[in-house]
Amino acid sequence: MTAHIGLSAQHVVDSLGHPDGASRPPVSAESLSRASELLQSNHDTWHIFFREATGHNHMAHSILTALALGASPSELERAYTDTEAIQRPIPAVDPMILTRLDADPQALESLLGWSDLYSTFLTYFQSQIDRHGWQSVVTTYVFSETPLAEKLLIKLYEGMYHSLIHLGLGIEFGQPGIIAEALAQAAAHEDGHIDKLLLGVEAAIAAKDDTRTETTVPKSLVQLVDEVRSHPRIWADLRFGDRWNRMRDSIMDRAADELIPIAAQFRIPASGMMMMAGEHADLLTIRTAEMASTAAYLAGASQSARRPRKIDFFLMHTVTASLFFSVFNAQEWIPRAMRVRLVEWKGRLDLAFYAFCKSPELDACVISDYSDDFTRDMDWAALYAAVNQEHDDGHVAKFMRALRHAERLSRPYEQHPVWAEHFPVKGNMWIKLARMALETTRHSPPDFKWIMGTGFDEAWERPDLKLAENRGQQGQSVP
């Protein structure tokens, strides 16, 4: 059994790719057709992991993002072929396990984390969607708060949010086949122990029986970032060489108890609302925007004073993922309390990613003062056109698209008398950060496009950065 993936013009119109209708690039019928063919090929041909650990197949992300940014058929082909060589064939379905799952869906719980069962999970979720519809299946397996759903929800946040991004794209573009891929990827994903933080925070709040309704302005995420930096017991002993395992082995296994009291302060009332000056404030919308602004700030403002600018690979993912919480917030079939929980988890886990990068110093001027000769005069449309021609695995385009959406989301609050200090990225900082993302990646081979842990001195000792500095690329250096 295989899902049919087919995109229509309405799917793109309804997407969040272009919040301002006037700036929407045209998407041709040929591009829609080619995107559907490429997504179908990826669905039928390739494993969701190109290697056993941390190797996420980004093809669907790249194709859908390029399409949303107005890609031509040839540019969509580029989005597919850029990473085709590294992919692994999709594994065979295990018929015995599939029969077991059909007979007892709860059997899935004991199979979570088996990456070689991806195809089996995919076939199972496709059959469930065919029978019950994708909204019902996502509700049952992700949002129902059963023991199985809780585990699968946590796994959506594992691996730098990749399964969550995949699910968000599937929902945004109305593609049940992509949604099935996301659920199967989450089920097959390795365990990074992030439940120690996410569930630990909720347990700590419940233990205090703290169900108060917010009546005062809460601490900003930026303030909580400062608190993380002020607690070196969380991050001071991190080792650069551990890279992929730092979140599990160091942050979650050894420092979660230190991080929980800080992360627990990022809260939204279950109703998503708050009384302020006699009026209802929509805290779900406000704090979703704040989360996106803070993620962008962490990604752009964490630099080295000794090297040309580079954006951190891990913090970049916190920005990319931020867009999809607007997708989830727009789904009335998801209970509002669950939509609140999704945003709370994102804000709390972003704090862990900041610690994971060794809590780098932050300087907003790094973003606000940024300029380079190539992108200086580019508007968003020019940036979209340029990034669609880049050889990339989709990361730059996803980052840029998320920034554009976050800019629109944050605009009402950037100068707000109550909320302005919660929004560290303001005005033209958004487009300057997008320009930085393009310029600092466009000449780099895949392994050198990003910094891998910006708070570590070792991350900045790469020969390419020393060479760039010696060549006098001061336009990209920190003032």
From Swiss-Prot:
<keyword id="KW-0560">Oxidoreductase</keyword>
<dbReference type="InterPro" id="IPR025337">
    <property type="entry name" value="Questin_oxidase-like"/>
</dbReference>
<comment type="function">
    <text>Baeyer-Villiger monooxygenase; part of the gene cluster that mediates the biosynthesis of the tetrahydroxanthone dimer secalonic acid D. The pathway begins with the synthesis of atrochrysone thioester by the polyketide synthase AacuL. The atrochrysone carboxyl ACP thioesterase AacuM then breaks the thioester bond and releases the atrochrysone carboxylic acid from AacuL. Atrochrysone carboxylic acid is decarboxylated by the decarboxylase AacuI, and oxidized by the anthrone oxygenase AacuG to yield emodin. Emodin is then reduced to emodin hydroquinone by a yet unidentified oxidoreductase.</text>
</comment>
<comment type="pathway">
    <text>Secondary metabolite biosynthesis.</text>
</comment>
<comment type="similarity">
    <text>Belongs to the AflY oxidoreductase family.</text>
</comment>
<dbReference type="GO" id="GO:0016491">
    <property type="term" value="F:oxidoreductase activity"/>
</dbReference>
<protein>
    <recommendedName>
        <fullName>Baeyer-Villiger monooxygenase AacuH</fullName>
        <ecNumber>1.-.-.-</ecNumber>
    </recommendedName>
</protein>
<feature type="region of interest" description="Disordered">
    <location>
        <begin position="14"/>
        <end position="34"/>
    </location>
</feature>
<dbReference type="Pfam" id="PF14027">
    <property type="entry name" value="Questin_oxidase"/>
</dbReference>
